[in-house]
Amino acid sequence: MHIGQRIREIMTQKQHSVVSVARALDCERTNVYNIFDRKDINTSLLQKLCVILDHDFFKELSKDTFKK
């Protein structure tokens, strides 16, 4: 799974703007766009995004890791 692309998909589905996520993360919009390009992400940032977007990315990553 490309985590950055998945974050973008969930943001779109839940109608969160880049601006609103940047504000919630206390960062610039460019940082959010940079997240979209990432194939991996640190856990503290992912945890914040889980809360902001009300989505469990950890569960998705776990399923992706252990699928047969």
What feature does the model see in each segment?
Residues 1-16, 20:
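A short, Lys/Arg-rich alpha-helix, primarily the initiator
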Residues 12, 23, 51:
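Alpha-helical residues within the helix-turn-helix
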Residues 15, 40-43:
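Residue at a beta-strand N-cap/secondary-structure junction
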Residues 18, 29-30, 57:
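The DNA-contacting recognition helix of HTH DNA-binding domains
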Residues 26-41:
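Recognition helix of helix-turn-helix/homeodomain-like DNA-binding domains
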